């Protein structure tokens, strides 16, 4: 097992990475102070890992309840969030009740938001079971739900007590979900660590084949990078925005098609291709680097052509973005691997990118 620490002073927490961690009681024990625990999971993950987690919690002598939600991005909304609150209230959960998010990014985001809101804040633990949630969404305290007009526009910054990333859970992940997680790994290397990007380029096949050593290294390095960024800029005042490379275009794809039509990682993969194209058109990135990025995204079995939503619709959706200021769209663009710039882009360059990258 490897442990990466997120250094946030009194709110620091560990990220434990390794195989067969969901069943290890000692990883949960230090982070559960109250008398009760509520596991939040979904209809896909519950039959796979619910019993394992409950067995791990049993020696602690806590009252354990489970809320099982429908699976998918389409359910990341107020209605589903209220199912968590219903479960907490029915179980008479108090301020010391610990929530455990057992699932992918949707479960983690909603459980974290519920924890931030219930009784104005209760502790929670992330147990991410998808590659995307292990390398990205479970780390850093971003929680929330979608709105029909924008992705993740309603939420809170609220840090977990711990992240327990069980690499073994990736063995049950569908190929499409695995590829979606590789997208966030590619993003992390592209924005922050050129040497890591080189490694990803050389090992993308091993990642898609689920080589355990490759996956463990990718999760570890991605978490190290994100932990460093979050420690420096927890609330996305500046530096943390670089983690949104590919997300401005990607969120527009998700909202434009309807949440759940494309997986988040698929939209981010394609969004990185679009952002790299715009980086070249605005004079920040060389063509050879753009081509390298596109090849890696394609090798990860991710889409590289965006849906044709229409130029006006793309622009409209990208204006509903947390980085936008006074209606001006800000993009995370590449200067070289490991270095980004946060900047507006000329309308003609954006339109040219849309023309070149949509089908």
Swiss-Prot record:
GO cellular component: cytoplasm
GO molecular function: 3-dehydroquinate synthase activity; metal ion binding; nucleotide binding
A biological process term (GO) from this entry: amino acid biosynthetic process
Pfam families for this protein: DHQ_synthase, DHQS_C
Localization per record: Cytoplasm
Keyword presence, Transmembrane: no
Signal peptide: none
Record's keyword annotation contains Cytoplasm: yes
Binding locations of NAD(+): 71-76, 105-109, 129-130, 142, 151
EC number: 4.2.3.4
The reaction(s) this protein catalyses: 7-phospho-2-dehydro-3-deoxy-D-arabino-heptonate = 3-dehydroquinate + phosphate
Function recorded in the entry: Catalyzes the conversion of 3-deoxy-D-arabino-heptulosonate 7-phosphate (DAHP) to dehydroquinate (DHQ).
Record-stated family: Belongs to the sugar phosphate cyclases superfamily. Dehydroquinate synthase family.
Protein name listed in UniProt: 3-dehydroquinate synthase
Organism field: Burkholderia mallei (strain ATCC 23344)
Gene it is expressed from: aroB
């Amino acid at each position: 097992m490897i442990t990466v620490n997120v250094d946030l002073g009194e709110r620091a927490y560990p990220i434990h990475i390794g195989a067969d961690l969901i069943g290890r009681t000692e990883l949960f024990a230090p982070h559960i102070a109250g008398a009760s625990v509520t596991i939040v999971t979904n209809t896909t993950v519950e039959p796979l890992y619910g019993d394992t987690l409950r067995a791990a919690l049993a020696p602690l002598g806590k009252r354990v309840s489970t809320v099982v939600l429908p699976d998918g991005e389409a359910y990341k909304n107020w209605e589903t969030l209220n199912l968590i609150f219903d479960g907490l209230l029915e179980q008479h959960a108090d301020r010391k009740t610990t929530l455990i998010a057992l699932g992918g990014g949707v479960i983690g985001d909603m459980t974290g938001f519920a924890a931030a809101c219930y009784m104005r804040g209760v502790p929670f633990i992330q147990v991410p079971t998808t590659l995307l949630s292990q390398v990205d969404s479970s780390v850093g305290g971003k929680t929330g739900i979608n709105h029909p007009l924008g992705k993740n526009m309603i939420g809170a910054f609220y840090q977990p007590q711990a992240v327990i990333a069980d690499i073994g859970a990736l063995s049950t992940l569908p190929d499409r979900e695995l590829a979606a997680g590789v997208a966030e790994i590619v993003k992390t290397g592209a924005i922050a660590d050129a040497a890591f990007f080189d490694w990803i380029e050389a090992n993308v096949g091993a990642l898609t084949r689920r080589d355990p050593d490759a996956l463990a290294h990718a999760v570890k390095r991605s978490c190290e990078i994100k932990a460093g960024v979050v420690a420096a800029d927890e609330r996305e005042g500046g530096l943390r925005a670089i983690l949104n490379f590919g997300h401005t275009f990607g969120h527009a794809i998700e909202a434009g098609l309807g949440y759940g039509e494309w997986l988040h990682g698929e939209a981010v993969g394609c969004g990185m291709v679009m952002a790299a194209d715009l980086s070249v058109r605005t004079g920040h990135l060389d063509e050879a680097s753009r081509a390298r990025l596109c090849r890696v995204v394609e090798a990860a079995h991710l889409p590289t052509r965006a849906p044709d939503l229409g130029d006006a619709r793309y622009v409209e959706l990208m204006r509903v973005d947390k980085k936008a200021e006074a209606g001006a769209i800000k993009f995370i663009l590449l200067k070289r691997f490991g270095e980004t710039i946060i900047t507006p882009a000329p309308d003609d360059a954006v339109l040219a990118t849309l023309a070149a990258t949509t089908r």
